[in-house]
Amino acid sequence: MPSRTPTDIWRCQRLILAARKGETTCQALHEQSIEISSSLKWFEEISEWMSKFPESGLYISTTIWTFLEGVPNEHRIKYDRLIRHYITYIQQLVPARLVTAYLDSLFKICSHPTRTERRIIGEHCGISLHQVTQWFTNRRFREPKTDSPDDGSTRFIPSPMTSPGSIDECSFPESP
């Protein structure tokens, strides 16, 4: 009998979770696809909004660029490079946070996406399939475990050897 791949195990987990919730798999997948498409629309709107900043020249009116108007040309080149470097850093930093927020919203919908879903997510975010897989793996690891019945305290069950009065009742094997 062939061994189960992780994808098969995740499908089984999805079926079990859907059965526990009292919904069919088709309903669960349909609801997931609606939530994923709505979050994708949000991500595209935010990405479009963020892409306007470097091209449209909106940053020219900021105080940094106003400050550069009074600087002589020989010094302005140095400041210009530094500010462009800083703006590029901010532009790279903000989309990374948007990607994290987007992936986090998708994690709330489905913590075990299929390979096809991960590939699509990677294409939308501009990251590789491996990065998406690693992100979901790390996020699942950080997720608090809810399976334990108690608050994490370990129980000690004494063995017959350590319980009081058990020395007399124990029988030791004879040495050869």
Swiss-Prot record:
Family under the similarity heading: Belongs to the MATA1 family.
Matching Pfam families: Homeodomain
Major site of localization recorded for this protein: nucleus
Keywords: DNA-binding, Homeobox, Nucleus, Repressor, Transcription, Transcription regulation
Annotated region (Disordered), positions in chain: 141-176
UniProt keyword annotation of Signal present: no
Source organism (scientific name): Yarrowia lipolytica
Function per UniProt: Mating type proteins are sequence specific DNA-binding proteins that act as master switches in yeast differentiation by controlling gene expression in a cell type-specific fashion. Transcriptional corepressor that acts in conjunction with ALPHA2 to repress transcription of haploid-specific genes. Required for induction of sporulation in diploid cells.
Recorded GO MF terms: DNA binding
UniProt-recorded name of the protein: Mating-type protein A1
Lineage, top ranks: Eukaryota, Fungi, Dikarya, Ascomycota, Saccharomycotina
Record text on subunit structure and interactions: Forms a heterodimer with ALPHA2.
Entry-linked InterPro entries: HD (IPR001356), Homeodomain-like_sf (IPR009057)
SUPFAM superfamilies: Homeodomain-like (SSF46689)
Localization: Nucleus
DNA-binding region extent: 88-147
Entry annotated with the keyword Transcription: yes
PROSITE patterns in the cross-refs: HOMEOBOX_2
One term under GO cellular component: nucleus
